[in-house]
């Protein structure tokens, strides 16, 4: 008979290969698969591998014009999820040739582009990716990284302090600049545009950039420290985004900001390249992440979005707090915080890390803790995140009863007290409250802050837990 065998056949015949030895150059993915009733896990896992690589629903004659064995994704291992009915972790290996070099956009289009609407699955979640060194090397990564940032700012041996300017919408540019100045003068390293602040009728971007730059230079002159304000360059088109970044560079400011999920990976990578070429640091906000990562059985875990950001490029990224008003279980959060900062991360399922990841020499990203935190959290934050982090207190600075500058003073005093106590060998986890109370003696600003927030807690059960 001439031709090929037409018709529909089971995916598992071609795409489930339990004997496959993964290659060092493969991209590996761990999917949490919830098959529809009656669909065997092997078929579900194979379907994911097929639909996110070379497969389609029926045999096609053009299959004969290529080598499926060379290009197909393979489901090479399946394990049931402990404590969950009908959930499995399916491990899929993708040959590197399926992906365009240096394109996070293409990587995601391939791996998570189509398969999440697949009918044979009730739900699907991408838990982790192993990016091979061969692929890592095709990305520029963060514009500068942790060490270069410290050198630029001349700030060592402690976490950096930030503050998001509130109310986030409605201030005029001049009043906004005033708020920035007060915070920086009081002792913060950075202030931040809120992620929703782009260029609205009440405050156009160019006016804001100019007033913030003025605030920055005034605060620098008064304090003798380098200051920064994250100027949000996010815009409706890539050209407009670049125009804003160029203007920021012309003003001579040290850092700009981007919302990488709403802005998109293509825009983000473009901006990251510009930032490296022009000496700008890049702060990344993760607006929209919870739409993708909050459901336990469907979507993508934030650790995947964090890896993607390190490849696309950013010097800071928001990463939850463990202690404030937003999600983040401690071990899981520290898992992806280490993925952002370190060169090499061992597989460790207790922290949700499914694969060993080697970033070789790609620069690291500073995790930003932000959301509902205040001076009483400082010992815990210093202990959990360590020196290489940015701690951001929005309401925890601007909500100070005496104003922004005293709010900034309170945070800086609390931070310096915690760092000193840690360096003297004290246990921040146990003696934290005591350390803050002692520091209050020398700082009326801190004492006032401690009084305001002594009872505030945001306590709900975490959603993001290991099984």
UniProtKB/Swiss-Prot annotation:
One cellular component term from this protein's GO annotations in UniProt: chloroplast
A Gene Ontology biological process term: reductive pentose-phosphate cycle
Catalysed reactions, as listed in the record: 2 (2R)-3-phosphoglycerate + 2 H(+) = D-ribulose 1,5-bisphosphate + CO2 + H2O; D-ribulose 1,5-bisphosphate + O2 = 2-phosphoglycolate + (2R)-3-phosphoglycerate + 2 H(+)
GO molecular function, a single term: ribulose-bisphosphate carboxylase activity
Cofactor note: Binds 1 Mg(2+) ion per subunit.
Other facts: The basic functional RuBisCO is composed of a large chain homodimer in a 'head-to-tail' conformation. In form I RuBisCO this homodimer is arranged in a barrel-like tetramer with the small subunits forming a tetrameric 'cap' on each end of the 'barrel'.
Family named by the database record: Belongs to the RuBisCO large chain family. Type I subfamily.
Descriptive protein name: Ribulose bisphosphate carboxylase large chain
Taxonomic source organism: Tasmannia insipida
Gene: rbcL
């Amino acid at each position: 008979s001439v031709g090929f065998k037409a018709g529909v056949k089971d995916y598992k015949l071609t795409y489930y290969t339990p004997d496959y030895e993964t290659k060092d150059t493969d991209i590996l993915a761990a999917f949490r698969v919830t098959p529809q009733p009656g669909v065997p896990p092997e078929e579900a896992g194979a379907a994911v591998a097929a639909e996110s690589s070379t497969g389609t629903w029926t045999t096609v004659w053009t299959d004969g014009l290529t080598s499926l064995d060379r290009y197909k994704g393979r489901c090479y291992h399946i394990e049931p999820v402990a404590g969950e009915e009908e959930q499995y972790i399916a491990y899929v290996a993708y040959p590197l040739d399926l992906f365009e070099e240096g394109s996070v956009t293409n990587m995601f289009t391939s791996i998570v582009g189509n398969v999440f609407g697949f009918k044979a699955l009730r739900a699907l979640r991408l838990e982790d990716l192993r990016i091979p060194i061969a692929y890592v090397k095709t990305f520029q990564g963060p514009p500068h990284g942790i060490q270069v940032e410290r050198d630029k700012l001349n700030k060592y041996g402690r976490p950096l302090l930030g503050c998001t300017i509130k109310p986030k919408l409605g201030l005029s540019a001049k009043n906004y600049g005033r708020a920035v100045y007060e915070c920086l003068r009081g002792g913060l390293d950075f202030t931040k545009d809120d992620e929703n602040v782009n260029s609205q009728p009440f405050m156009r971007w160019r006016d804001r950039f100019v007033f913030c730059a003025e605030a920055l230079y005034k605060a620098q002159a008064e304090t003798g420290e380098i200051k920064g304000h994250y100027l949000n360059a996010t815009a409706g088109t890539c050209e407009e985004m670049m125009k804003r970044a160029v203007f920021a560079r012309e003003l001579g400011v040290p850092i700009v900001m981007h919302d990488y999920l709403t802005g998109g990976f293509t825009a983000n990578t473009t901006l990251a390249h510009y930032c490296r070429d022009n000496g700008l640091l890049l702060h990344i906000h993760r607006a929209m992440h919870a739409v993708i990562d909050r459901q336990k059985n469907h979507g993508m875990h934030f650790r995947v979005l964090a890896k993607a950001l390190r490849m696309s490029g950013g010097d800071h990224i928001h990463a939850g707090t463990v202690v404030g008003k937003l999600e983040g279980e401690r071990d899981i959060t520290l898992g992806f915080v280490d993925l952002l900062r370190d060169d090499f991360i061992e597989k460790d399922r207790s922290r949700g890390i499914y694969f060993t990841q080697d970033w070789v020499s790609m620069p690291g990203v500073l995790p930003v803790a932000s959301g509902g935190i205040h001076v009483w959290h400082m010992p815990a934050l210093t202990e959990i995140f360590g020196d290489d982090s940015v701690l951001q207190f929005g309401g925890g600075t601007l909500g100070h009863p005496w104003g922004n500058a005293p709010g900034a003073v309170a945070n800086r005093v609390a931070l310096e007290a915690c760092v000193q106590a840690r360096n003297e060998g004290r246990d921040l986890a146990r003696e934290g409250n005591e350390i803050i109370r002692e520091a209050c003696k020398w700082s009326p600003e801190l004492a006032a802050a401690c009084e305001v927030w002594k009872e505030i807690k945001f306590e709900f059960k975490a959603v993001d837990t290991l099984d």
